[in-house]
């Protein structure tokens, strides 16, 4: 696959704008998936080397020269991807929340703080604590709420990711009853006060995702996904000198974290 880093970033920006237009969590799902798996793959852990393309699979030597190297490199002749990657990582914080005159939408999970003003409610402050994307437990604490004379109810919307089949919600330790479907938002509407605490726990099942059979090169291939993270098998991870083409994954193994 081609998977240019800048094209993945464009996918993030496009779906972010669709989410702003329609408030549909499916667009935030795409933003999250692309950020974690298609944008971050474009830069090395030390931040010094970059991919122009992000190949899904690298095969043995070919009888012709590829335009782009198989490994990340410090210099790319078409130098759009490195600065675009850095810009996107730096501005990802702007995708975490969206607001309306009387609601806050939590689109991306991760440890952060929010300070904003709702047109119909007033100043709002939130602190989010979580080990996401490794764990599905998220804690949100209200650090600023409208003054007593101006208190009005407003809604906090929590994204239910497309991979989440079960979630639990508590407010100030009390369970909130409800069934939340994947690809939606869970809404909590109340008069909030400083110190209120929301505990949102999403199950993170391990899933096997099969490639589209209409794409010949990836037919009968799967990836392992847990939460928002998509995993792949790399040659350096294989012990005993076995070739990657000879490796199989039993479906029962996918359920073993």
Predicted regions and their residues:
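Well-ordered alpha-helical segments within folded domains of soluble proteins
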Residues: 3-19, 82-91, 138-139
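Well-ordered alpha-helical scaffold segments within catalytic/enzyme domains
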Residues: 10-23, 40, 143-146
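Carbohydrate-binding surfaces of carbohydrate-active enzymes
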Residues: 19-28, 161, 188
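C-terminal beta-rich recognition modules with glycine/proline-rich loops and embedded aromatic residues
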Residues: 29-37, 42-150, 179-181, 190-193, ...
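Beta-strand-rich binding/interaction modules
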Residues: 151-171
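Short strand-turn-strand beta-turns centered on an Asx-Gly dipeptide
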Residues: 170-173, 227
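Surface-exposed loop/edge segments in extracytoplasmic proteins
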Residues: 174-178
């Amino acid at each position: 696959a081609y998977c240019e880093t800048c094209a993945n970033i464009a996918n993030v920006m496009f779906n972010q704008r669709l989410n702003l237009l329609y408030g549909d969590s499916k667009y935030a799902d795409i933003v999250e998936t692309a950020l974690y798996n298609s944008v971050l793959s474009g830069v090395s852990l030390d931040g010094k080397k970059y991919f122009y393309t992000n190949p899904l699979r690298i095969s043995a030597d070919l009888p012709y020269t590829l335009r782009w190297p198989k490994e990340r490199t410090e210099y790319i002749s078409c130098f759009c991807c490195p600065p675009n990657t850095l810009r996107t990582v730096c501005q990802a914080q702007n995708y975490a929340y969206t607001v309306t005159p009387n609601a806050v939408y939590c689109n991306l999970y991760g440890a952060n703080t929010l300070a904003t003003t709702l047109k119909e409610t007033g100043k709002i402050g939130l602190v989010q604590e979580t080990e996401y994307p490794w764990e599905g437990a998220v804690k949100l604490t209200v650090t600023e709420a409208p003054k007593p004379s101006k208190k009005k109810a407003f809604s906090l919307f929590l994204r239910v990711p497309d991979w989440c089949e079960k979630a639990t919600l508590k407010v100030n330790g009390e369970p909130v009853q409800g069934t939340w479907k994947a690809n939606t938002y869970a809404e909590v509407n109340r008069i909030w006060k400083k110190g209120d605490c929301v505990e949102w726990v999403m199950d993170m099942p391990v899933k096997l995702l099969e490639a589209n059979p209409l794409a010949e090169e990836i037919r009968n291939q799967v990836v392992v996904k847990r939460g928002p993270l998509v995993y792949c098998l790399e040659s350096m991870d294989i012990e005993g000198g076995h070739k990657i083409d000879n490796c199989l994954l039993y479906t029962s193994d996918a359920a073993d974290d």
